[in-house]
Swiss-Prot record:
This is Aspartate/glutamate leucyltransferase. It comes from Campylobacter jejuni subsp. jejuni serotype O:6 (strain 81116 / NCTC 11828). Disulfide bonds: none annotated. It comes from the Bacteria. The gene is bpt. NCBIfam families: PRK01305.2-1, PRK01305.2-3. It holds the Pfam family ATE_N.
Length: 239
């Protein structure tokens, strides 16, 4: 298993305007499910064959958060979202790349640029492949959502030994009635329950960032305490 580690220089934080960020990376050519799981438990995130985590000098606002699946009960509003999507077709498959995917990705980010002032980058086929398709091995999948044969949402996930790592989701803003972002996460929870998995790893919760603060609304959940190196001691998560 080839592994190469490196770090970025300090740059503007993408989440908090008054902060600087620095990212540590691991490039892992043929990552096993076990290693992936151990890294995710320690606060890393996977995009393609790259794993990353923040190592910012004067900030610890990025908190890894995971949902406790076995204790999770769907609220009345969440059941309404599920019922609204009774005719939405959901396909679990290995990550795909098509014109549909790239068009939907671009449409979603144009919408978020206007709504939340996100920085938008034009993504090529190769860049999308490197970020969301490459390195899926025996754990990477996408949930593809179709309404009347139209691809309206893509949710990229890793199905690991103890849970599901939620990587990235994008959807068609013209179908906002269906609450597709929320519906995709509820699907992850349903799948985890059926597979007897314990956690949904939601990535980073940042209290002062609107785009990431919503994650704390999914309870019960746990926050990772401190950082540990791979296979170093026991990892501590707390409610």
């Amino acid at each position: 298993m080839l592994e190469i580690g490196f770090c970025t220089l300090e740059d503007q934080c993408p989440y908090l305007k008054d902060k600087r960020s620095r990212i540590e990376y691991k490039y892992i050519e043929n990552c096993s499910k076990e290693i992936n799981n151990e890294l995710i438990k320690r606060g890393w995130r996977r995009f393609g064959r790259y794993f990353s985590r923040p190592i910012c000098k004067d900030c610890d606002e990025c908190l890894s958060l995971r949902i406790l699946v076995n204790e999770y009960n769907f609220s009345r509003s969440e059941r309404r979202v599920i019922n609204k999507n009774i005719n939405t077709k959901v396909i679990l498959r290995t990550p795909n790349l098509s014109n549909e995917h790239l068009f939907l990705y671009d449409k979603y980010h144009r919408f978020m640029e206007e709504k939340k002032n996100w920085k938008r980058y034009d993504l090529s086929f190769k860049q999308y492949y490197n970020l969301y398709v490459d390195g899926f091995m025996n754990f990477g999948y996408e949930l593809a959502f179709y309404i009347e044969d139209k691809l309206v949402c893509v949710d990229l996930i890793d199905i690991l030994e103890d849970g599901i790592s939620s990587i990235y989701c994008f959807y068609d803003p013209d179908f906002s009635y269906f609450s597709l972002g929320k519906f995709s996460l509820l699907n992850e929870i349903q799948i985890a329950k059926k597979m007897n998995l314990d956690y949904i790893y939601l990535g980073y919760f940042v209290k002062k960032c609107q785009s990431l603060s919503y994650k704390a609304d999914y309870t019960p959940n746990e926050i990772l305490k401190g950082t540990k190196e791979l296979f170093e001691n026991e990892v501590l998560w707390e409610k």
